[in-house]
Amino acid sequence: MSELTEAEKRQLLREKRKAKLSQGGGLDRLKKITGENNSKLSTDVPTKEPTADATTTATELPTQGLETRINAHDDPVSEIPDPLNEGFDGKEPDLDQLIASMFNKSAGHENPNSEEQGVPELMRRFSSILQGGDSGAAGLGAEAGGINPLDLLNSLGGSNIGKAQEEYGSTPEEIEFNKKSIAYKKHQNEVLKAKILVVRLVLILSLLFVYGRDFSLSLFTQTYAPNGSSFMRVFLTLELIFQTSLFFFISKNKNFTDDSLISKLLNIGGAFIPATYRNLLQTASKYQVLLSMFLFDLSIVVVVFAIRAAFNF
């Protein structure tokens, strides 16, 4: 008997499988392979019938009022309370009392007896300030007959006003001392500016005395001396050295405060400007101070030459 080839073996296996499938054993064999043959679980979903205990323990909802409303063509939803209108009695509130109560709550000084007295807490505070405004330090303490307005602004405005209280103090003695300190700093600033101005004037006048003779004195002929350009070179060199030194000086000196237009704008609206742009504007204000000083020095030179040309000396 000859051995079967591989193709014949595969053919016999296919025929056996077809015979098994034709006998209906394919589904059982598939379940055996997938492991579902020994599963005891049922695919039917049992329906749960309510027990007697559940029906007896359930809370019965009142339906008599609901049926009455439905029969009377009422909307049952209208009986549900609105959280937004809770506590609203239908009367229009007084706007002044509403604003005063909002300020009192934000300041944390609610006075339950203020409504009984007829005067809100906020109004009493302002009236006390006005009553004590003519005595003492403009009503800055209890001794002056009023209250400290910084305390009021701090309670209403928050941390930004608190910085002002830290700067000026909370007691009359601290306020008076800090006022004197601020006035002293302003005086020192003015003295410093005066010294800088004197130094500039001395340098410019000395330069004009030494080099100004060689410069032309006539504004009509516009003639120049042979070494007249040396004055401008020395003047610009000294200005460059002076302006550079002054820039580093005013950057490190806290007592020096400039009165430029940019600084005034920063003092007014600095809180609304981002920190990056605020630093750039502060640097620009220093350059503006230097530019104004240079223009002032140049104007002195022009005025001196104009006077010499006019009087011809």
Swiss-Prot record:
Membrane topology: Multi-pass membrane protein
Compartment annotation: Endoplasmic reticulum membrane; Golgi apparatus membrane
A Pfam match: GET2
Native species: Komagataella phaffii (strain GS115 / ATCC 20864) (Yeast)
Biological role: Required for the post-translational delivery of tail-anchored (TA) proteins to the endoplasmic reticulum. Together with GET1, acts as a membrane receptor for soluble GET3, which recognizes and selectively binds the transmembrane domain of TA proteins in the cytosol. The GET complex cooperates with the HDEL receptor ERD2 to mediate the ATP-dependent retrieval of resident ER proteins that contain a C-terminal H-D-E-L retention signal from the Golgi to the ER.
UniProt topological domain (Cytoplasmic) ranges: 1-191, 251-289
Residue stretches of biased makeup (Polar residues): 35-45
Keyword flag Protein biosynthesis: no
Protein name: Golgi to ER traffic protein 2
Lumenal side: 213-230, 311-313
Family: Belongs to the GET2 family.
Gene Ontology cellular-component terms listed: endoplasmic reticulum membrane; GET complex; Golgi membrane
Compositionally biased spans, kind Low complexity: 52-63
